[in-house]
Amino acid sequence: MKMLFTIFGWLIAVIFLILSALCLWAGNWIPAIPLILAAVLLIPPLREKLSARLGISLPFWPRLVLIPVLFMLSVYLIFAGMGNKDSIYKNADIESRLMSIYDARMETFPVPYKSRYIDTKYGKVHVIISGPEDGPPILLLHASAMSSWSWLYNIKELNSKYRTYAIDTIGDAGKSVLSNIEVYPADGPSLAALYEEIMDSLDVASAYFIGASQGGYISSNVALYAPERVNGLILCGPMGYTGTNASVFRILLTTMFPIPPLQNSATRWAFGDDPAINAVVSDWFGAILEGVISRQARPAPFSKDQINKIDMPVLLLLGSRDGLVGNPEDTEVLAENFPDARVHVLDTGHLISAEKPDRFNSLVMDFIENRKE
């Protein structure tokens, strides 16, 4: 039994040393100190030298308590170093990098547009408005860790007939700004109320909603709690229709240790292997992993009863290789509870609208044209 404990201790020590090396590689040396100390306590020769140097004994039970305490201290120091009590951004440099990338992406936006800021109870919400002024309205709600520039693959086709309002999610990276980072729409009813407030400011009585990932979760909540504002839903790899995918811990690991190999791996895993897509999202996503702690509602799974209440037309688009949402078959089964839904599974990862823009645009335009009231 003692040998078993020793082997297990060595394995945990190796893990701690690897984690401390990742901290040092990321330039975050303070959290590495408790990890190294915990590893020393787990390795008998090093522990004996430490005990002799300090002139104290280190019995088993105190060590058993001290080691997890040191580990938790390291985790706390990692996240404390990322935090900023006044902003979702770790520091001004991260924010500046992201805004520069945002502006550069908007230089490639294929249609004329105007930006508008709307004052809400949570802060300023940034909206990109484009398309014919007399066109039927569509609200575009982007995926988490993206922003409204991500619709650049679809906007030209949509604006051929429709007026679009691409909204930067408040509390996420982008040009919307929370007044207080501790006060944000954290549940379905508050999300619906916020988007009603935005629509009132835009003088939009009702609209089709196109929501990707977290944007799909937000759109679904507006449909649930303010159904009169939603003409129809286009949901692209939406959150809230399956349980939390265990692989999201990969994102957490990369956030804790933002080194290039982990960042590149996380980008490919989240957005697929398409080099063109990775070239567009990698610098943006890398900066987010390095220094953004978003403040937004966590997508709890919708119940079958809730889905059944979404009785407006729904177009559900799923990616067969989506590493974030998970198995599309599970979502398809749950989608059977929609009273009026079409479901399509595309050969894509998570960013359906960017990976297969022509197919996405065709499905969306056909859906709206055939469902007009």
Where would I find each of the regions flagged by the language model?
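Flexible "cap/lid" loop of the alpha/beta hydrolase fold
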Residues: 217-225, 232-259
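Conserved HGGG/HGGXW glycine-rich cap/lid loop of the alpha/beta-hydrolase fold
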Residues: 129-174
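Active-site nucleophile elbow and catalytic-triad environment of alpha/beta-hydrolase enzymes
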Residues: 290-306
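Conserved loop-alpha-helix segment in the C-terminal half of the alpha/beta-hydrolase fold
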Residues: 318-348, 354
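Alpha/beta-hydrolase fold catalytic core
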Residues: 75-136, 162, 205, 369-373
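Active-site loop/oxyanion-hole signature of alpha/beta-hydrolase fold enzymes
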Residues: 166-210
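Catalytic active-site module of serine/aspartate enzymes centered on a nucleophile-bearing elbow/loop
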Residues: 341-373
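Short beta-strand/loop motif that positions the catalytic acidic residue
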Residues: 310, 316-318
